Amino acid sequence: MILAAGFGTRLFPLTIDRTKPAIPFLGKPLVGYVAEYVAKYGFTEVVVNLHHQPDSVIEALGDGSNFGVRIDYALEEPNILGTAGALDNAKHLLQDEPFLIVNGKIITDINIGALVEAHRLSGALATMVLKPNVKREKFTIVNTKDGCVTGFGPHAKPFTEEEIRDTTGSLESPLMFTGIHILDPRVFEYIPPGIFSDIVTDIYRPALTNGEKIAAHVADGNWFELSTIPRYLDISLAMMNDRDVWLGENCSISPASSVRDSVIWDDVVVADDVNLYRTIIADGVRIEAGEHYENAAIVRADMVRNCTEIPEKALKGYIQGENYIVPLN
């Protein structure tokens, strides 16, 4: 199952007209990479949950055939149900055998080829794929012992100045959850039907208290989570293979302008004497002659004007002419 129902509030305004997994990432919808990833390891029957802007996910994935999978959609109405409630909503599609869950907002090459068999042999309620949080980003710490999850801590804290100066190489990286896990159908015994519930807070924590085994699979490999605009830009630039600009379809960029380290979506027009550096330019935006932007995301202003509510977690922006500008620093 691919989780694709979230609001994407921290990616606003890029998610005004689509859910987070449906945003384009280097020429393909983000959730398309996830579909191809699970197909690579033989998971070809896929359930995708929907809530916010559901049509954007359906448009991105279709029936799944372009990505090597066959998709059943599970719509959550009228309310979003969370990472555990989503499973209950799709129980009729998942309850017959152990199933894989992958967050729809990640890019990864973690090898999960042997994970299903390892899970079967473990007898665990679930097997969580974990990864060292080398940069100590703001993810929940997962505590483990002897290959099992023992509990969940607070968010990891950034390195202190003293730790940064440490040259002994003795600093430990806490483990974090990658959003990839395999669950036994017994998990449905723990999920309250029909209401919002979170898989870690409402299911895994009580299950551990009840003596259930949750296996920990610590993985190598690349893993990127694109839940904020700065992270989306940084990861895009890192994966562009030395390209200076990612250009979408039907774009017109004046040769008299400078565009560097930027991600340009579809139908964008850049007039003369424009300077863009580290920018994300969304669909249909026109950058007028002489404008200069650095470290910014830009969408059409009319999209924001027609938006009933700007999410509290969204970065603050401002309207300039026909565009809505969101500074990223």
Language-model features: where?
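N-terminal glycine-rich phosphate-binding loop and ensuing alpha1 helix
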Residues: 1-58
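Generic beta-sheet signal
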Residues: 3, 25, 49, 76, ...
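Glycine-rich "substrate-gating" loop/helix at the edge of Rossmann-like oxidoreductase active sites
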Residues: 20, 76-81, 220-225
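Generic preference for hydrophobic
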Residues: 22, 73-74, 152, 216
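Conserved beta-loop-beta/alpha segment of the NTase-like Rossmann-fold superfamily
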Residues: 57-146
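Catalytic-core segments of class I nucleotidyltransferases/pyrophosphorylases
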Residues: 98-102, 107, 113-120, 131-136, ...
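Structural signal for interior beta-strand "rungs" in well-ordered beta-sheet cores
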Residues: 241, 245-329
